[in-house]
Amino acid sequence: MKVAAGNGILIFALSVFLISLWPADAAALTLSYFAEGAAGVRTNDDTTRKDGYNLLEGRFQVKGSHSPEALEDWRAELTGKAELLADGYDESLKFILREATLSFTPADIVDVKAGRQVLTWGTGDYLFINDLFPKDYVSFLTGRDDEYLKVPSDALRVSVFADAASLDIAVMPVMEPNRSVTGTRLSFYDGTRGAITGDEANRYFQKPAETIENIELAMRAYKTFGSFEGALYYFRGFYKEPRGIVDAATERFFYPRLSVYGFSLRGPVLGGIGNFEAGYYDSAEDRSGLDPMAENSSIKYLAGYTRDLGNDLSIGAQYLVEQMLDYGSYRSSLGAGEAVRDELRHLATLRVMKLMRDQTVEAIFFAFYSPSDNDAYLRPSVGYKITDNMKVTAGANIFIGTEDHTEFGQFERNDNIYARVRYSF
């Protein structure tokens, strides 16, 4: 059955937002703004569209909220966040709607939020197992603010708070994929060509049809046990990366169906905060592992620990293991010359954060290292809050690897140094 309007929730929420955002009392409308300029230069020549840089842009954001008197009994709130982006790399001017929601409380234990919104949950730091909501890794790898790692979805979210457990349900009528690396701004390893590819890549990603059967569903049930919070997760939808191949010769890819069942536990451990999370990825397109055109099922495990060492210094470490299931079937289905993935992929991360000068300076070092892939990704950054309104941030994205086909090794020629200036008012 065809969905009559794939973006119906967005259109409805935005319409209500625009109409209701004209309160009789201007004081009832809360607005905030920021203007930001960002630039990032590459340290290597490559085959991308513009070799000298991969970030040059200015953006202006408006964020507003309003509590309409007509829905006062339901504690309703309308929120919106919109941006105007002048992108020098793409040579384009874009209007971006990041948020347009109506939230209300129809009962004491129920909250509802409908419209365009950023959804997230899970316990990882830059590592996501049960968070199957869309991400923008192009922004992440080129120096944009962390806010832009999370991509908004058109969704209905219902939260129920009960003594037995609390429940979050998110329904996404239209599948929103990740913003994937395609070669335009960042080069990558193209498995169909067996080489690093840039702007010459001509990939086509086939999104699922907008039908009732393809509506995505995400659920989380969570409860506190003493000082620990435990959670169960369920997701039914699609991989957010195009991990299926329609036709390798014409570089056509699709997003395979996916169900995920997971859990997490988080609480105090040895003077810090520990977390453990796991998820079983059921790849509906290839449960046997024999189809080389679709992703195998897998299990992912994550353990993490963070601690405040005092004097405004904190550290955090994580260890992730990704286990491919039916690995023998995967190996037997490989074609001649294809890069071979490991059955177990290991990934460790380290975060060190230091605040200085009355907490106006924030220095962060974040590192990814995979002992199985023998590659790494380093993210140093320093932010300085010059005034209450102005902040300057500088950092780098550094990739290290010995093989072209590994997660971070494929990006070795994409090293970049960036700077951002933001003025909020």
Q: Where does each model-flagged region fall?
A:
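Outer-membrane beta-barrel strand-turn architecture
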Residues: 66-70, 106-108, 161-164, 224-227, ...
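Transmembrane beta-barrel strands of outer-membrane/channel proteins
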Residues: 33-41, 78-82, 114-116, 169-173, ...
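Repeated loop/turn-to-beta-strand initiation elements of outer-membrane beta-barrel proteins
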Residues: 29-31, 70-76, 110-112, 164-167, ...
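Detector for outer-membrane/organellar transmembrane beta-barrel domains
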Residues: 71-72, 235-237, 266-288, 292-368
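Outer-membrane beta-barrel "beta-signal"
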Residues: 398, 411-425
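Outer membrane beta-barrel
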Residues: 65, 70-188, 226, 401
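Hydrophobic, lipid-facing positions within transmembrane beta-strands of outer-membrane proteins
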Residues: 56-62, 97-100, 152-156, 215-219, ...
